[in-house]
């Protein structure tokens, strides 16, 4: 079994963050481990508080795993502190881990900023160029392009063509794969996977509900799982999209505040848990 590491924030409601990552790893047949960058007090409706772990704690977590355990892929999620981002960057260089997926979490599903401005600059200009694939949503894509072009007047994305254009700007700047997540754009779940030379428009079924907390985290973790299992980048993304679709179809309903995706839902359909133990 391959080992996959999530470097991300903790979500106490377990819909997103490292909790979503661990459930995704289990559902995709890899062994999941975590390095926590921040503690968040949040639910599908709002983020109440974000508190970064100390640089000492982050360093010791990274060393505890990477010094002694072979890691086949890494998923990176929320990094709020620039100091922590710098340490993660240095650690990736030191340990030379392959198959790094970066979900540049800047804005929560509920619309709250999750990252400091100084950290955004470091991510875009340094960390982006060290990973294998970046998976921004539409708002994050626009924000990243504004930073790359140093132009605050960039229009928001309102078409697949603009998704592709902005994605190409990021891909050319980073020389890496980019997956633009366009789930909020149209009636279809249209994502665009591209690098400097290749472009793939990936369409899928869209489930219209408000129980989608954790979709981005689950997608990036599933991509990392598939890369660890030696699938190509295109196949890793396609399989991850199908996994997230199943997780949405089996989502957990919390009532008025919406709900969260259920990464284990499809597995539970095919296994009688009560007969296992």
For each predicted feature, which ranges?
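Short, small-residue alpha-helix embedded
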Residues: 19, 142-143, 209-233
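Conserved phosphate/ATP/ADP-binding segment of small-molecule kinases
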Residues: 117-199
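Charged C-terminal helix
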Residues: 49-52, 234-277
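Conserved N-terminal subdomain of the carbohydrate kinase-like
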Residues: 2-6, 26-109, 267-269
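Nucleotide and nucleotide-moiety/phosphate-recognizing core
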Residues: 86-94, 176, 190, 198, ...
């Amino acid at each position: 079994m391959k080992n996959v590491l999530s470097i991300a924030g903790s979500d106490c409601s377990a819909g997103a963050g490292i909790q979503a990552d661990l459930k995704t790893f289990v559902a995709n047949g890899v062994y999941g481990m975590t390095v926590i960058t921040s503690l968040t007090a949040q639910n599908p409706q709002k983020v109440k508080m974000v508190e970064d772990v100390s640089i000492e704690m982050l360093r010791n977590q990274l060393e505890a795993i990477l010094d002694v355990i072979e890691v086949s892929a890494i998923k990176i999620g929320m990094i709020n502190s620039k100091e922590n981002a710098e340490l993660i960057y240095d650690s990736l260089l030191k340990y030379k881990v392959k198959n790094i997926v970066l979900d540049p979490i800047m804005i929560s599903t509920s619309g709250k900023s999750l990252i400091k401005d100084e950290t955004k600059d470091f991510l875009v200009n340094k960390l982006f160029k060290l990973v294998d694939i970046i998976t921004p949503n539409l708002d994050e894509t626009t924000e990243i392009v504004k930073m790359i072009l140093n132009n605050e007047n960039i229009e928001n994305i309102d078409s697949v063509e603009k998704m592709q254009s902005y994605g190409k700007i990021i891909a050319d700047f980073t020389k890496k794969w980019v997956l633009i997540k366009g789930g909020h754009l149209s009636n279809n779940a249209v994502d665009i996977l591209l690098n400097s030379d290749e472009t793939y428009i990936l369409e899928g079924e869209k489930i219209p509900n408000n129980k989608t907390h954790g979709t981005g985290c689950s997608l990036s973790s599933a991509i990392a799982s598939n890369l660890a299992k030696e699938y190509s980048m295109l196949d890793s993304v396609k399989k991850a999209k199908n996994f997230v679709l199943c997780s949405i179809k089996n989502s957990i309903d919390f009532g008025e505040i919406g709900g969260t995706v259920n990464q284990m839902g499809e597995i539970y359909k095919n296994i009688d848990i009560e007969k296992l133990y």
